[in-house]
From Swiss-Prot:
<keyword id="KW-0408">Iron</keyword>
<dbReference type="Pfam" id="PF05995">
    <property type="entry name" value="CDO_I"/>
</dbReference>
<comment type="pathway">
    <text>Organosulfur biosynthesis; taurine biosynthesis; hypotaurine from L-cysteine: step 1/2.</text>
</comment>
<dbReference type="GO" id="GO:0042412">
    <property type="term" value="P:taurine biosynthetic process"/>
</dbReference>
<feature type="binding site">
    <location>
        <position position="95"/>
    </location>
    <ligand>
        <name>Fe cation</name>
    </ligand>
</feature>
<dbReference type="GO" id="GO:0008198">
    <property type="term" value="F:ferrous iron binding"/>
</dbReference>
<keyword id="KW-0479">Metal-binding</keyword>
<keyword id="KW-0883">Thioether bond</keyword>
<protein>
    <recommendedName>
        <fullName>Cysteine dioxygenase</fullName>
        <ecNumber>1.13.11.20</ecNumber>
    </recommendedName>
</protein>
<keyword id="KW-0223">Dioxygenase</keyword>
<dbReference type="InterPro" id="IPR011051">
    <property type="entry name" value="RmlC_Cupin_sf"/>
</dbReference>
<feature type="cross-link" description="3'-(S-cysteinyl)-tyrosine (Cys-Tyr)">
    <location>
        <begin position="102"/>
        <end position="178"/>
    </location>
</feature>
<dbReference type="GO" id="GO:0017172">
    <property type="term" value="F:cysteine dioxygenase activity"/>
</dbReference>
<keyword id="KW-0560">Oxidoreductase</keyword>
<dbReference type="GO" id="GO:0019448">
    <property type="term" value="P:L-cysteine catabolic process"/>
</dbReference>
<comment type="similarity">
    <text>Belongs to the cysteine dioxygenase family.</text>
</comment>
<dbReference type="InterPro" id="IPR010300">
    <property type="entry name" value="CDO_1"/>
</dbReference>
Amino acid sequence: MSMYTHQSNNELIPLKTVSTLNDLIKTIRIIFNQKEINVNEIHKILNDFQCDFTEWQKYIYFNKTHYTRNLIDEGNGRYNLFLLCWSEDQGTRIHDHSGAHCFVKLIKGCIKETIFEWPKYFTVEKSNYSINQIDLPLTVKSVSEMRPGDVTYMHDKIGIHRLHNPSTTETAITLHLYFPPYTNSMIFEESTSRMKKMDVTFHSKFGKQIPQ
């Protein structure tokens, strides 16, 4: 359960309990109606938020061959709120976030996050990809494990990362908030640092599976 106040145009929104998924969606929409977005405020709301697990059920789709991305709210083009559903031992490729701010909250299971330094040929400030990519392995910056309720924040200025469900017996579910939303990202080979573009697609939208 989360309690929040938010100042909008010098008017204080009354204290409200955020204890349902619908409350969370409304709260996030209020925040994104403002000109300036406070990432610390978003982190606190997501960190404090808990709801009944049954509220996630319509967005949960598992696939034995790959994790699934399931859209909950597209925020009028300003953000994407979605669930990732991970079967046993599934993970992402190492990837960037196309300049977006990315929050991840673990709903169920365990997720291992490995953050890597940017390849030597890449300059984040200039978004400069070198044509001559040197085949050097990526450098690990940090490794951590998320437990239910944990919230992490990621941005390209921090590095690139990989998420993985390390369990061979349990599934995992994560809630993601990305802003601004994006339709593709760069994926990287760990052993060579080489990269290529990957489209970002959804397995389901608003609880309905998309025909593949």
